Amino acid sequence: MTHILTLDNAVATLTQGGVIAYPTEAVWGLGCDPRQEAAVLRLLEIKRRPVDKGVIVVTSRVDVLRDWVDIDALAPARRQDVLASWPGPHTWILPVTARAPRWVTGEHDGLAVRISAHPVVAALCAAWGAPLVSTSANLAGEPPARSRAALEPALLATIDGVVDGEVGALAQPTRIRDARSGQILRD
């Protein structure tokens, strides 16, 4: 049976290194505390995703990532584009500092970041007060789940709980753009 988490339960689960599922703008996501290497490695093992690919993090405020990203390294117009798009369904690859953990960035010199306007994600991030991994709740190479009912039972059996809610109206996962160049990396 799937354990449904309140926001307070979700925060406690994340603090303890747990992995949770939650609805996002287009699909169900898996999340954990990106500051805890063991939690991220567990999430990646659940998904069967290589660590070198990196993960997206969501947050309620960009300043909680100040130790990991250097938004001021962007050209002023690019920085304005990024900040003006948030909160919203926009994921940007931001330049990282030397303190950004490789288990989050993978082999990349940037970190994928989104400040979501989705009500569940926004409330979860605000309650959590820290960055949160956001990767689709599916095994690598499989289609992402667009409803809680579509979450694989085998995947649900490996995680610590679910924050209930509905996915947003996007038909596809969020677009990913490089904040330095503006180039679209995933559409």
From Swiss-Prot:
Task performed by this protein = Required for the formation of a threonylcarbamoyl group on adenosine at position 37 (t(6)A37) in tRNAs that read codons beginning with adenine. Catalyzes the conversion of L-threonine, HCO(3)(-)/CO(2) and ATP to give threonylcarbamoyl-AMP (TC-AMP) as the acyladenylate intermediate, with the release of diphosphate.
Its domain of life reads: Bacteria
One GO term (biological process): tRNA threonylcarbamoyladenosine modification
**Keywords, A to Z?**
ATP-binding, Cytoplasm, Nucleotide-binding, Nucleotidyltransferase, Transferase, tRNA processing
Q: Which family does it belong to?
A: Belongs to the SUA5 family. TsaC subfamily.
Reply yes or no: does the keyword Nucleotide-binding apply: yes
Q: What class of enzyme is it?
A: transferase
Q: What is this protein called?
A: Threonylcarbamoyl-AMP synthase
Origin species: Xanthomonas oryzae pv. oryzae (strain KACC10331 / KXO85)
